[in-house]
């Protein structure tokens, strides 16, 4: 299926390649580079590119393109999911999926790729199995390996490989047994100039950190599970129980993993946590314009909006901007015409405001349209959809674990039109 894999950084350098069947020349990536040049940004690079002899299927993660080379037709989503699993495995092993981390652990990277694909077909993709096959890097292990010449590859078959629960290794023991869940939601929204919501959607995930001894059987229930759409499950979840009772029943993997991802697409369920008052105007036959923006939290949220950053791609005719910020700091790049305002935390008592004069190039015509405002923010201990965990029950073991749930709401693609 997958003949080769190329890892390419943002500069267009191929810094790692792996071949399973026959060696494919790096020149095949020229088709990818052509598509990359035509794309406006990295998100617009086509995930599937057809060439005379191959198909190139790629993903973009953490400033790295994972480009796979296929010679026969396969379901593209199957390959894309596998590439995401590769990136997740690197993240799990090295703490980050970056070019530096991959280069620093290049031997382990090749060992992982050799185990994850067998002759080009996915074989072992579960983190627990891989960690028994190939030990994660540590400073001590790296020193020992360099002295003895040994590798990180284990010499025994993983205990979960032949089990009907392949995602969990046997004989797990912890002094402190704990189960923590992070409910993380990203809100994508488009707000028109009058403040009305044109589009709103929530993308959510539940990330888990499970450190429980033995073979625990968990049940996680919610206050309002019916609001979830398009739920994607980890293989450990019993789907029939979810269908009938809307309860997540599962024997968890050991360590960190993504339990589910979901979407809330009903617009009446999506609460917009911030509002923006704006006045951006340009006059005919004038070399200046006016810029005035205020950001505030919606009164019904009850939580602090923090980490607020506003980014504006100003028209090409803008020469510079003389602004005053009542809170935070701003920068304007005269080359890229990007205005960035780092607001920080919003307090309802004193709303942050940015206003001043926009200077245009002399003789330049009035900009045809006003720019859009892109807002980033974060709200701790709030799931904007209203999703709440009801309880976590454990069966099969007699100890009492520590349990905790954390909620985070973040802005995804949050745009305000002016």
UniProtKB/Swiss-Prot annotation:
Homology family: Belongs to the adaptor complexes medium subunit family.
Q: Where is the protein localized? A: Golgi apparatus; Cytoplasmic vesicle membrane
Gene3D superfamilies hit by this protein = 3.30.450.60, Mu homology domain, subdomain B (2.60.40.1170)
What organism is the protein native to?
Answer: Gallus gallus
This protein's GO cellular component annotations are: axon cytoplasm; clathrin adaptor complex; cytoplasmic vesicle; cytoplasmic vesicle membrane; Golgi apparatus
Task: Give the function comment from the record.
Answer: Part of the AP-3 complex, an adaptor-related complex which is not clathrin-associated. The complex is associated with the Golgi region as well as more peripheral structures. It facilitates the budding of vesicles from the Golgi membrane and may be directly involved in trafficking to lysosomes. In concert with the BLOC-1 complex, AP-3 is required to target cargos into vesicles assembled at cell bodies for delivery into neurites and nerve terminals.
Which positions carry the signal peptide feature in this UniProt record?
none
> Record's InterPro entries?
Adaptor_comp_med_subunit (IPR050431), AP2_Mu_C_sf (IPR036168), AP_mu_sigma_su (IPR022775), Clathrin_mu (IPR001392), Clathrin_mu_CS (IPR018240), Longin-like_dom_sf (IPR011012), MHD (IPR028565)
Supply the Pfam families for this chain: Adap_comp_sub (PF00928), Clat_adaptor_s (PF01217)
Mode of membrane association = Peripheral membrane protein
Q: Where is the MHD domain?
A: 176-417
Binding partners and assembly: The AP-3 complex associates with the BLOC-1 complex.
Protein's name in the database: AP-3 complex subunit mu-1
Which UniProt keywords are given for this protein, alphabetically ordered? Answer: Cytoplasmic vesicle, Golgi apparatus, Membrane, Protein transport, Transport
Q: Name one GO biological process term.
A: intracellular protein transport
Identify the coding gene.
Answer: AP3M1
């Amino acid at each position: 299926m997958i003949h080769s894999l190329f890892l390419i950084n943002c500069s267009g350098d191929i810094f790692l390649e792996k071949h399973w069947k026959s060696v494919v020349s790096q020149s095949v990536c020229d088709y990818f580079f052509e598509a990359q040049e035509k794309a406006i940004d990295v998100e617009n690079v086509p995930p599937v590119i057809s060439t005379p002899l191959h198909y190139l299927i790629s993903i973009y993660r953490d400033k790295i393109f994972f480009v796979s080379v296929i010679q026969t037709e396969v379901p593209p989503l199957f390959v894309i999911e596998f590439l995401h699993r590769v990136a997740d495995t690197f993240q799990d092993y090295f703490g980050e999926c970056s070019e530096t981390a991959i280069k620093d652990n290049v031997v382990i990277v090749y060992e992982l790729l050799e185990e994850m694909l067998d002759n080009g077909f996915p074989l072992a993709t579960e983190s627990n199995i891989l960690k028994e096959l190939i030990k994660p890097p540590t400073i001590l292990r790296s020193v020992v390996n360099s002295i003895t010449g040994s590798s990180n590859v284990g010499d025994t078959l993983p205990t979960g490989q032949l089990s009907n629960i392949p995602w969990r290794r046997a004989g797990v023991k912890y002094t402190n047994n704990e189960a923590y869940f992070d409910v993380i939601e990203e809100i994508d929204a488009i707000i028109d100039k009058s403040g009305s919501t044109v589009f709103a959607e929530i993308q959510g995930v539940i990330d888990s950190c499970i450190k429980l001894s033995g073979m625990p059987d968990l049940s996680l229930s919610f206050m309002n599970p019916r609001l979830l759409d398009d739920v994607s499950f980890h293989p450990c979840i019993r789907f029939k129980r979810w269908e009938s009772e809307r309860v997540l029943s599962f024997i968890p993997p050991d360590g960190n993993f993504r339990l589910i991802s979901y979407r809330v697409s009903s617009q009446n369920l999506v609460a917009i946590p911030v509002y923006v008052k704006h006045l951006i105007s340009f006059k005919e036959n004038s070399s200046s314009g006016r810029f005035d923006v205020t950001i505030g939290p919606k009164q019904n949220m009850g939580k602090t909006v923090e980490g607020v950053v506003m980014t504006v791609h100003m028209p090409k005719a803008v020469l510079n901007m003389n602004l005053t910020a009542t809170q935070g700091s701003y920068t304007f790049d005269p080359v890229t015409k990007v205005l960035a305002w780092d607001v920080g935390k919003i307090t309802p008592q004193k709303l942050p405001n940015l206003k001043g004069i926009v200077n245009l190039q002399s003789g330049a015509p009035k900009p045809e349209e006003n720019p859009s405002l892109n807002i980033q923010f974060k709200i701790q201990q709030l799931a904007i959809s209203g999703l709440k965990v009801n309880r976590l029950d454990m069966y099969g073991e007699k100890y009492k674990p520590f349990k905790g749930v954390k909620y985070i709401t973040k802005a995804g693609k949050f745009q305000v039109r002016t």
